[in-house]
C-alpha cells in the first residue's frame, strides 16, 4: 500500500466536503496508509471548535485516530526551514511538505497551488482534478 500525507484541504473535503468529494476520497484512500500531523489537526478543527460543532469534532477525531501521526520534531522543522528558504513556501506548507518527506510518504494530496508546485520535486502530488480523473 502506498503512503499518503493529506493536507488540510483534503481532510476537510473528506470530513465536511460534498457527497461527491467524500465518496471520491474514501474510494481512493482505501488503497493507502494515511499520514497526518498535529498541524493538520489544528488547521481542520479550527472552525468546528470556534462554532462548537461537536459532531464535526467527533468526525475529525475518528479520522485522526485512524491515521499514522507524524511527530513534528526538530528534524522536520529543520527540513521545513530549508524548504522555506529554497522555495519561499509559507511556513505551514513547508511543515506539511517536510512532514511528508521525513515520513517517507510516497504521495502528498493537496489542492494548494504553491505547495503542489514545490512538492512535485520531492514526491507524487495528487490534487482534486487528479482524483476526479480516477473515478
Language model features: what each stretch is:
Residues 68-117:
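Active-site neighborhoods of divalent-metal-dependent phosphate/nucleic-acid chemistry enzymes
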